[in-house]
Structures are given as C-alpha cells and as structure tokens.
Amino acid sequence: MSQLYDLRLRIEEKIKSAGLDPMEMKGKIGLRSGKLLAFITPTTPDDPEAIAKLKLAAREVLDLNL
C-alpha cells in the first residue's frame, strides 16, 4: 500500500468520525492539494510533493496533522 493511499484512508476516517459531509471535505482537500482522493488507489505511486500537499490540505481543511 502506498503512503498516499494510507493518507487517503486516514483523511476519510477523520471525515467520517467528525460527521462531516464527505463530498464537501474531499472536494476542498482535492482543490487545495491538486490530488483528488478518489483517484488515489493502493497502487498509486508515492510522490513526495503530492504527499506534502495532501498533508497540508488535510491540516488546513480538517485540522488534521498527518
């Protein structure tokens, strides 16, 4: 499993546990990171820049430190 996919799962769990609208939150994170969560699969290759952007977007949108 890739690091990007692991981040996706952790973000989705945070959205679910906080009772937030998944479409809205995933959309906001996708716009900020430039990476749509739906397209991150277990075989998505890790890219350090994409990982950093996704972590930053999760912190800004969900106040989630990954």
Annotated model-derived regions:
Residues E24-K26:
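Short alpha-helical "recognition helix" segments of helix-turn-helix
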Residues I11, P22, K55:
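Generic structural marker for isolated residues within well-ordered, non-membrane alpha-helices
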Residues M1-A18:
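A short, Lys/Arg-rich alpha-helix, primarily the initiator
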Residues L31-D47:
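Recognition helix of helix-turn-helix/homeodomain-like DNA-binding domains
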